[in-house]
């Protein structure tokens, strides 16, 4: 466990260092200044690391978390917490982890592996016992961090997000902004010089909402029990093992400290496996070693002694050892000045209001200053958004890489052990300091550097400098060639070139596993403790990708500002600056073949969001126009590749998946600058259309509040997306009704009633459906922020439309003897009518047919730059070969499970084509490719077919037997060549039905003269007369019904009008084929904010109910 086990060591072996405290008492200052009860004029300011505190902010280990989360209960808890802090004169500032942190990637990989095992244990427990799992298996519900962030913003609690190195930014932000203490649970904070360190795991709010308690860690007590001076903590942390120098690289050193006579020494020679000593044993042994170091400034001598047993990559380990010391030295160094906005009148330790620093400096406590001093601050590294230090808060973290120890050991006053520190100078708890300390022992603590300005503080990145350099590349747009040894967007443009090749050097998998890199000459032949996982991260985990397209500087500035303020989904900044994201594990049954992994299910959403973020459609359209004007062929567009780190069935998190960004084919999405910063009504329309297109829900009914209330738009979009999955059926009829019924139930806003609701037997499938749905909500938040937030964040929050426990109860009721819809709505006819309307809106324009074969996995796309082995298989839209296919990936495999659906005209054609086997992940124009992609031979229609040439029948063939599943016979299949239909493609069988679910990235429309006529005809007809009758009936239906149309099944799955699509961006040079689909916003002249369909965002009755919920929760705690 390395340094991460130090926090648990404090809890178990240093009970005197863990003191319970009541935060309201600290805020009142009852024991400050000789015990005088003088109310402070400034609140007690606490910084909370949300990364360690999510389960406490959620409300604790309630058993409902396994069902997808009870978000209204969480909302009530946070409302009570905000009220308690406001009434108790406490100011909370919650800091979320928004950093990619490639330097800690190996820690994330290990954590994902453990959580994946926990998810399987949870599923097995629910399947066997039908009860909630124990709280020790707590796995945060999907999207929990973002829901907590939105809820805190709602209750006016200040939030922020880290951008590069979460731990360093939290420490720096705490010191620079005058916080009294830090609420967290991480060993990195315990080993840094934090003024007052409180436990995030022990944070509890009483039932009456008036007492907020936690525990304070007294690090001077920890140092006393270890008999180690705190100024040696940086070396101590570096030798325990950390994200820079992992404990696997220190295994030989740790075993050598124990010696051959130790009772555990026999464990180290077990069959050439990497066995690490127990964490508590290592901590004591390393503390003894560090205490006996004579000269802490001679790092070379220390490193030589530490790695004397190492037989491979010793020089690299020494470098990383020095970097680790520099990292912890920088975070442990106290600030020499404090921001002036903090220096306000507050009762000080002298019994009178005065100017006091946020924490008592070590000089005031007679604690000798640390000898691990940093050199002058390194040159500033430009931030991605512009000038250094600008943003919602300044950073002044020094660069740890070049740090060395301050030698001057002759006048060094430190002592090796803790016992030599004067007793009167040792740290005392905040609430126990009742007597003044002699101020003459230190310099003036109230002196403020006059040259200090918060906006111009130094800004440098953390130990991992990838983000800033990558952003600089994107701003400049330089066409720097990407190399095999560099990162995709970071070609030698970093402050520390060593970081590029070392990749923050760390191991990446659990002990005992075997990797190819662990074999060969680097391992040696007789190494007693093989360091199997000591290769640098980038060499065996990362994959080099081409540089990202340039992004406008103003867009990056806006992205950085919103990211730091906690106002934007963190994936967006990661994609724009680094081109990669990390996807967390959710509760999934890996033995269940019916439900796909969430990472694969919503990958098409992310692909289109990537295309929106990099403005693929507009940039490629401009390039094509320029080539057309110059009478040249359109250039070959290089793909935009995003790396996705994820762990699911059949996929290890140790290597990323390369995913291509896609652009919409139906319309040209404007560039990101216009989406985010445009003020025109047309821009607002485009934001909404881009979001709906990403979610495959670009239908008029989605914007009609009579069918879909605006606060339920995200719910309906996610459900519609799940229904359209081209693989096995995800949602059944009763499951879809259960989702809709619980969203309209009055119980959704009554968390007290839901707490009393009893679930007889948890449904394992319901738990997985909840996880899949919340994963879709997570991606909807991502898409909404990327498209410029067309839906206000207040209407995206899941407490408006989902409760896991309520969904479980509705699902059990719906699955039991096929309960009628009116009973599912508790006998409320109006609710049942609303559910019916919402279901029709979700299924609008979709036609379902039962498939004959299970959909196979499509092969990976043949992209340039990479070997085929670098692409793991994945679902989602796969780019067909250039200029070949007119195949589709339709919504098939359901057999009409959602009620009666109208399938006329092209929908009849689609239904017949799907029933006859022309349904798969994709299909090409040639039969061999089609059969290969569908995993089997196409079935022959039962009534046979005939071949016509120039209108004359020249051949017949017999049919096959009736297919399984009770389906009727297929209509007679006709293949016409030449004749009246001359000019269309050969054979009606290959009618280009436009795909519903996805489109390849480099697949561009090729118009032809009679495209509309072909798409309007059924692919199977007995004669030309049937075709004419079909067209006539089609045209009549299009006039009589607003929801039916003559066009093809457009890519968004909507009924279409047979007329050319209007020019979306006012351009006339688009040479693509006319679109025949009716979009929800197919004309920019349609207003978005003046339209009553969209103006209803602020007038929903659900909003008033949600406001009443907040008042009820606040009043309940009084």
Swiss-Prot record:
Region annotation RNA binding: where it falls in the sequence: 829-1118
Quaternary structure, from the entry: Interacts with PURA. Interacts with SRC family protein kinases YES1, SRC and FYN. Upon tyrosine phosphorylation, interacts with PIK3R1. Interacts with IGF2BP1/IMP-1 in an RNA-dependent manner.
Role: Component of the oxidative stress-induced survival signaling. May regulate the activation of SRC family protein kinases. May act as a scaffolding protein enabling SRC family protein kinases to phosphorylate and activate PI3-kinase. Binds IGF2 RNA and promotes the production of IGF2 protein.
Subcellular location: Cytoplasm; Cell membrane
Name of the protein: Constitutive coactivator of PPAR-gamma-like protein 1
Source organism of this protein record: Homo sapiens
GO molecular function: RNA binding
Positions of the UniProt region annotated as Disordered: 374-533, 921-945, 1025-1102
Chain positions found as Phosphoserine: 960, 1023, 1044-1045, 1048
Low complexity composition-biased segments: 376-396, 1038-1051
Positions bearing Phosphothreonine: 655
Native organism taxonomy: Eukaryota, Metazoa, Chordata, Craniata, Vertebrata
Location, primary (coarse class): cytoplasm
Stretches for region Interaction with YES1, SRC and FYN: 339-405
Transmembrane helix found in the keyword field: no
Tissue localization of expression: Widely expressed. In gastric mucosa, detected in the bottom region of the foveolar epithelium (at protein level).
Basic and acidic residues bias (residue ranges): 481-502, 1026-1037
Post-translational modification: Arg-982 is dimethylated, probably to asymmetric dimethylarginine.
Positions of post-translational Omega-N-methylarginine modification: 873, 884, 886, 982, 986
Family statement: Belongs to the constitutive coactivator of PPAR-gamma family.
Membrane topology, record value: Peripheral membrane protein
Associated disease: May play a role in the progression of scirrhous-type gastric cancer by supporting cancer cell survival during oxidative stress.
